[in-house]
Amino acid sequence: MAATTSKIDDSMPARISSDCPEEIREVLYYAWGHDRSGLKKLLKTTGKATAQDPKTGETPLHAAIRACGPASPDDDGQEEDGSVEEAKDIVHDLFLQGAIWNDVDSNNETPGCLALRLGRKSLYQLCIEAGVRAELLFALMGDYEELSSGSEDGDEEMEVQQDDDEEAPQLVSTEDVEPTVEEPKFIPPDAKEKQVTSEEYLNSKLVYDDAKLVDSDLNGVMMAWETDIMRRSVAALIPDSAPGKRILNIGFGMGIVDGMFAELKPSRHHIIEAHPSVLEHLSKDESKFGPSWEKSGPEEGAFKVHKGKWQDIVPKLLEDGEIYDAIYFDTFGEDYSQLRYFFSECIIGIMDQEGKFSFFNGLGADRKICYDVYTKVVEMQCADAGLDVEWEESDVDMSGLEKAGEGEWEGVRRRYWTLDSKSFEGAAVLRYAVGTSNRL
């Protein structure tokens, strides 16, 4: 989450530390001064665009943006002052030389977070565009690595052999080697924050109460405050509330969205859930989606909880010829690559031509720049997968969600939604995608 504005000193002495290494200080000064010609000379050296003050984490991107200062309250963003125009050139050059769009400083702000806080909309937009380019490139590189790794039919690796009569290299005494002194490096504020993986999540013990579902590390898996968001998602998936729809939900959690789907009297309602604690909860007699619910379907197998990972279950549904009118995706502990794999590789085989797909969009929801970047990335990659995407926005009532450890977040380790109303210049907004097939 980006820092608040009240305690941040944006002056140059505060951001470029007195003991910052000379070669880093130099590039920061040039970026701060918007000296394009001088900076270009420095950027010829590899790594200069990504340099960071080891104490403050200031990067050349931060420096170029911070030097503009805050925008005037009556600035509508249509006419920007000369310093912003100069900064745009510097930011462009830095991104061209490999500057990282989401590096954070000691305030836990990315360059985009800083531009947003200062009200510099055009600079913020440049950061979004750079983030989108970077994420799309990483996705392409990941696809390439997946295709090329483990190939047994490709070129064999070249083996280097040493002739028996070749003289062996002499051993070098460790006393003759001068130890290298590592330059101090900036440590991000959240460097020690534990990241949740799917494997760790599935092996953890979950605890239910009326307001939330948390894992053994107190990560919020699902919370009651999401109810209104899910209600809007259901309305978008089935806008006429028509009965008889074929529904697939991936990730049961607290059963919020499944309860809403059930009220619409679907003809088929399938749930995929992998976590043992959730499955145990579902198996109880008092569960609304337990054995008695499965038996209440219009035909055998119409209402069913599929136990296991969706990566294993979906191929079986495809083999069985299952087709759905509405598909909702809300897993936990998985990164974006898994969501992308689902809508790129799986949707086409199990969704009706007139069907709709949606997911809980918490991608980067603890930082607006990340949220905006992933909104564009998802839209572009859904289009590549043959899905027409329409984003709908839902106001989020932030009462009780403002502070970590308080209100709705009491008993939860970290807030996974932190975008307040200031982030959107109005009510807090959650975007959710509704994808429909554009394939003939």
From Swiss-Prot:
Q: What GO cellular-component annotations does this UniProt entry give? A: cytoplasm; nucleus
Cross-referenced InterPro entries: Ankyrin_rpt-contain_sf, Arginine_N-MeTrfase_2, RMT2/GAMT_Mtase, RMT2_dom, SAM-dependent_MTases_sf
EC numbers on record: 2.1.1.-
| Region of interest (Disordered), ranges | 147-194
What biological-process terms (Gene Ontology) are attached? methylation
Listed Acidic residues bias regions: 152-168
UniProt subcellular location: Cytoplasm; Nucleus
- Keyword Cytoplasm present in the record's keywords: the answer is yes
What GO MF terms are annotated? protein arginine N5-methyltransferase activity
Q: Which residues form the RMT2 domain?
A: 192-440
Residues annotated to bind S-adenosyl-L-methionine: 201, 230, 252-257, 273-275, 310-311, 330
* Residue ranges the record marks as coiled coil: none
* Bias type Basic and acidic residues, positions: 182-194
Keywords on record? Cytoplasm, Methyltransferase, Nucleus, S-adenosyl-L-methionine, Transferase
Quote the function comment for this protein: S-adenosyl-L-methionine-dependent protein-arginine N-methyltransferase that methylates the delta-nitrogen atom of arginine residues to form N5-methylarginine (type IV) in target proteins. Monomethylates ribosomal protein L12.
Query: What is its quaternary makeup?
Result: Monomer.
Give the family this protein belongs to, as stated in its UniProt record: Belongs to the class I-like SAM-binding methyltransferase superfamily. RMT2 methyltransferase family.
Protein name in UniProt? Protein arginine N-methyltransferase 2
In the UniProt record, the gene name given for this protein reads RMT2
